[in-house]
Amino acid sequence: MSIESIQFTLRERFAAPLPEFYQRRIIFWQDEDREFESMLDELYIPDVTILKLTGTNNFAVKKLLLHDDLTGNYLIYNPFSYADPKDNWLLDIEKFSEEYRSDLISTRMNELNIEASPAMRKTVKLYAKFFDSKERIERLKRIGREYHTPLQLHIDIMAVLAGLNGGSAQDVFIAVLSAGQGEENNAVLSNIKKFGNIDAFWQLVRKYTGYIHEDEKALVLFAAHVLLTALAQTMNPSVLKGLERFISDSNKAYCYSIVHEWRNREDNGALWELCRSVEQELHLASRFEKQDIETLLTADIFPSIHEVILSRFFSEIADHVVKTELMLKTAENRRTSGWIERFENYYDCLYYVAKMQNFYQENAAGFHIVEPKAIWKLYTEKAYEMDSFYRHFHYAFGCTLKNSNVLLEDKLKHAADYVEGLYQNWFLKELTGCWTKAISDNLAALGYVSEIGKQRDFYSHYVKPLAGKNSRAFVIISDALRYEVAAELCDTITRTTKGTAKLDAVQAVFPSITKFGMAALLPGRKLSVNDGMDVLVDEMPTRSTDERGKILCAANMNSVAVQYTDVLNMKRAERRELVSGKEVVYIYHNTIDAIGDKAPTEKKVFDACEDAMQELSNILRIVINDMQGT
């Protein structure tokens, strides 16, 4: 800056009106780097006395300003800075005076809302290369912070160099560790070295995480330090004996927060790879394998903890050792642990094996019931849960196969063999045998089981009483929907809607295949079969939706039958028009049967059950919102 420019600015400052209650103006020209000391003799400002501090005249200047001359205007040139404000004899006068700076650093500090203190000025000087770029300055400015301490300025400058829009030291550390473990190829660390201050970075690292920088493998060791210090927050110290060099006790909570924050981000793939690398380098899995399950339950951070826990349980299950209480406790406990999204389906498998085993233990003696109605009650109130546990196990098992874990895949498959034995060879065998024996006399004499509602009475018992001038009966028929799936859907409807749901069961017609079951749900007096094995109701065919609609209309002319997919594709106005004036609406849904009825896709039936429940919940919303269902 030229002497002319400085002189012009200072003359303007002194010519400006004085603040209220002030009789004169004193301005301290701060120039710690003595950039403008040589220009001082050329400076002339009318009616202003210019004084230069020499380091030995401070007391004399103070006496002059506070005693000898209380009315004169003064420009005090100060080329000194003080590490300790107590050393500044003129600090009290500076407090009620004005400040002027003419150097680039001061201009920059003012522009970026950086406090004009010696400590902040020193910090700005550290980043000369950073401030060479207008783009970097603009990005720092956009953070919009006021800087009163060097710490926050260090952090924000490094955040800019890491490609962030501000943040915390934690965000900077995550950005550095995400960029790779090799210092030469780590773009973020290279930026900090080139345009920032690498020493300041490692000082920040030490302050927050406790890691002391080492020249060899600095990033690798930093990563290991953060992860193991975080692990120490949730694991018994005895497990980590021999790894003390990687752990800072006073920084455990902070390191844990780094990992927790990073892991909860969508882009946590680099953390996963980092954990895997450290696990392998320090042989952590073998260390965890020596611990009991209770010790590992609360431990977090490393994926191998999940693998050790699950591997042990699956191996035990395959050997017919099923610790139900511990398995249930583990499955529930681990649902909130880190990396659960990658292991959730495995824990679901564990959970449902335990639930199946519990049911088995409660009924290990078998089912010795002779009354059909009592067996019916047992199944509809309790035993159906075994079917539900089995389905949920296989659904979770199928999900694991879509993105399998090499260490767990075979162990889970061996555990699945135990599940099949428990379900097929015990549950189905025992319950089916009991049921078959109990109903044999009824079937021989009547062709059905007495004292249990019949599918053939569905229309007269459930539909007809609801259909009338002031009400409309909606019937959603989902082919091959098992009772246990319906029970879960009933709970879902109760939980997610304002209405109420009730679950009931009736015995199917024989044979219990689709074309007979669909016909049995229609009104009419007589069910028969022609020579072509077509099922008829009162001599009318029942194969197609239109044919079923005609049978419905024969019983109530204000009826309609439609497929779920057709309703789904209709516009809202079309849906309203479809049911206008109707008292009975049959909607046919076929997701499960369409999958399970064909050999190539029958293994997908467990997925189809999940889809079916979502679709049935959806059609229920459509009925309520678009078809005036209540």
Specify the residue positions occupied by each region the protein language model found:
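Ligand-binding pocket scaffold of soluble enzyme catalytic domains
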Residues: 479
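…; additionally, a secondary subgroup of soluble metalloenzymes is captured
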Residues: 1-472, 482-629
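Hydrophobic "anchor" residues on beta-strands that sit immediately upstream
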Residues: 475
